[in-house]
């Protein structure tokens, strides 16, 4: 009988030792994952609900260039989309950006829904009105070359026999919302008692003519016939509203040289640190300023800074540094913004209208190039590249810098009227050879730079009105 008792005593001693040996191993394989999964669930559930509350503070309103808009307004808009409290930043993968959180554990794959998700309130988010497609609009156009007398001859495509009329029957549709068509009555009420200046080259003038034509359904303005169109003012007496144009080729001071070739290949002296006085001396009296430029920077230039020549473009003169067109363009934009930001007591709104690409095919403008398309591109059929891409990038960069520096003038508001992508899709919207008589001898025989009226440029005023109605909106990221 002693043998079993001896075995029992030995077993009572050895069994606890075995348990002490394997217990840590069992804990590592089973106990710790269970504890980790439970504690992580509690932590994520708590942090998710707090993140959803605090996430609006992550919005950056001061830096502006992205493809999204955001507002705290509770009032719905015709082009709002619902979304939850979490800001869905495509560049961020933080946990609070997910509606459902995925956690792996030893027990399998758990889908964890943050606490109080059902209590989240819907907010309204403004979409990017500049990202979209052209869609058919059988109701267009809203004026003709007979109802509007402001159309420049070179953009009067119907008068000069353009055979296809489909280019007029499109409207811009943003991807995630709707863009209301231009309402001339609403526009004139918003700008009642104000002044609006367009500063730029002939494409800026093209924009002004489009606006005047759209407003002609309400009122024809009184213009000073003694003034050259490039520096003209139009007065809408009923609304006490004035439109003015300031012609400037480069935004900064430019002088055509007396030596060298003449015509479109003539040289200009460009003073990169001096704004063009034709607009800089008068612009402070306006409430709205729309600035634009671009086409004139791709021609022969001598560049000056502080009255000293620092280089040239397309000059090929021994001993003179040949720089790129975009160097001059960047400096000119920076000087322009610096001038406007430095205006004393100016509290208006300044719009940078971005570059509208030309569409020459088969050669350059002076080498037989033409634009014969009759339909818009889809957004997946073409892309911005080369000089157009670099020009647009410079505009975004300089706008961002100016927006950062505008705190010196608290009342001034900078806005980006980004038409580049939507106009890239409209190779069919140019006059081509239908801006003059066939036998006329003109410098730009096939015009693939300017835009027919009526035509796609009318949508720029859809944007302008929408932005005037929504002054509190900022582009979120650049």
Swiss-Prot record:
Biased composition (Polar residues): 92-110
Family that this chain belongs to: Belongs to the PC-esterase family. TBL subfamily.
Gene Ontology cellular-component terms listed: membrane
Misc note: Contains 2 motifs that are conserved in esterases, but it is unlikely that this protein belongs to the catalytically active pectin esterases.
Keyword line: Membrane, Signal-anchor, Transmembrane, Transmembrane helix
GO MF terms, alphabetically ordered: O-acetyltransferase activity
Biased composition (Basic residues): 112-125
Subcellular localization, as worded in the UniProt entry: Membrane
Biased composition (Low complexity): 50-68
Top-rank taxon, per record: Eukaryota
Name listed for the protein in its UniProt record: Protein trichome birefringence-like 20
Residue window of motif DCXHWCLPGXXDXWN motif: 447-461
Transmembrane region(s): 10-30
Membrane topology: Single-pass type II membrane protein
